[in-house]
């Protein structure tokens, strides 16, 4: 059964399919006019088509399902009972308030309880949610909740550190400012030493 988040993604995907490429390009052409440009000049003739194509790629997460990525897990762990940590998962996203890029890295750790997953699938889960309009807080919770649902680990930790271009390019214009969000569950929620070890491994060792 799909989660509420996945159901919303499906509904949005259906809405997108009902829009023709011509309608999307027309909207982009209108935007070019609004900012004061001439969409008929040589350099902009193909711009609406290019933007439509790149947006389909940048927001591909609306057409992807975490169920398909995490639907298959492995139950043979050969007695391994220590944390699995995947760090420095680079991603780019876009803030839902200004549609300006968010660029950052995600770090994930989980303490298996008879279930493990291919390491690349953790990175793919990050990408699914990154390729949607986001707030960093929501994305952190979505990644954590998805892994928790399918792996049912004894402990789970997710840390995302990112620079928001909406803070660097406009408004206060503070380039280089990093935002850090975390989500701890189970063992990592209860054990402060485990939390500290996770923070040291993901942020303290380079």
UniProtKB/Swiss-Prot annotation:
Q: Name one GO cellular component term.
A: cytoplasm
List ligand-binding residues for Zn(2+). Answer: 95, 98, 166
Q: List the disulfide bonds.
A: none
Q: Does the keyword GTP-binding apply?
A: yes
Q: Which UniProt keywords apply?
A: GTP-binding, Hydrolase, Metal-binding, Nucleotide-binding, One-carbon metabolism, Zinc
Name its pathway: Cofactor biosynthesis; 7,8-dihydroneopterin triphosphate biosynthesis; 7,8-dihydroneopterin triphosphate from GTP: step 1/1
Question: GO terms for molecular function, please?
Answer: GTP binding; GTP cyclohydrolase I activity; zinc ion binding
* GO process annotations (BP): one-carbon metabolic process; tetrahydrobiopterin biosynthetic process; tetrahydrofolate biosynthetic process
- Entries under InterPro entries matching the protein: GTP-CH-I_C/QueF, GTP-CH-I_N, GTP_CycHdrlase_I, GTP_CycHdrlase_I_CS, GTP_CycHdrlase_I_dom
Catalyzed reactions: GTP + H2O = 7,8-dihydroneopterin 3'-triphosphate + formate + H(+)
Q: Which Pfam families match?
A: GTP_cyclohydroI
State if Oxidoreductase is listed as a keyword: no
Supply the EC number(s): 3.5.4.16
Q: Which PANTHER family match?
A: GTP CYCLOHYDROLASE 1, GTP CYCLOHYDROLASE I
Subunit record text: Toroid-shaped homodecamer, composed of two pentamers of five dimers.
Family of this protein:
Belongs to the GTP cyclohydrolase I family.
Q: Return the protein name.
A: GTP cyclohydrolase 1
The organism named in the record is Bartonella bacilliformis (strain ATCC 35685 / KC583 / Herrer 020/F12,63)
């Amino acid at each position: 059964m799909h989660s509420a988040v996945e159901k919303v993604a499906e509904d949005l995907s259906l809405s997108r399919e009902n829009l023709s490429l011509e309608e999307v390009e027309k909207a982009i052409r209108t935007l070019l006019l609004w900012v004061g440009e001439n969409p008929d000049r040589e350099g902009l003739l193909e711009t609406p088509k290019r933007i439509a194509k790149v947006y389909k790629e940048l927001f591909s997460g609306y057409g992807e399902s975490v169920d398909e990525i995490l639907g298959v897990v492995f139950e043979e762990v050969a007695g391994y009972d220590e944390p699995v940590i995947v760090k420095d998962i680079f991603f780019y996203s876009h803030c839902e308030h200004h549609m300006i890029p968010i660029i950052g890295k995600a770090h994930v750790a989980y303490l298996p309880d008879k279930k493990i997953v291919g390491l690349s699938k953790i990175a793919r889960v990050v990408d699914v949610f990154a390729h949607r309009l986001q707030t960093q807080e929501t994305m952190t919770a979505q990644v954590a909740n998805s892994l928790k649902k399918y792996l049912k680990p004894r402990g789970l930790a997710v840390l995302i550190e990112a620079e928001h271009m909406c803070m660097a390019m406009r408004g206060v214009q503070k380039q280089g400012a990093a935002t850090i969000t975390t989500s701890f569950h189970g063992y990592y929620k209860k054990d402060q030493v485990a939390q500290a070890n996770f923070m040291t491994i993901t942020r303290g060792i380079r």
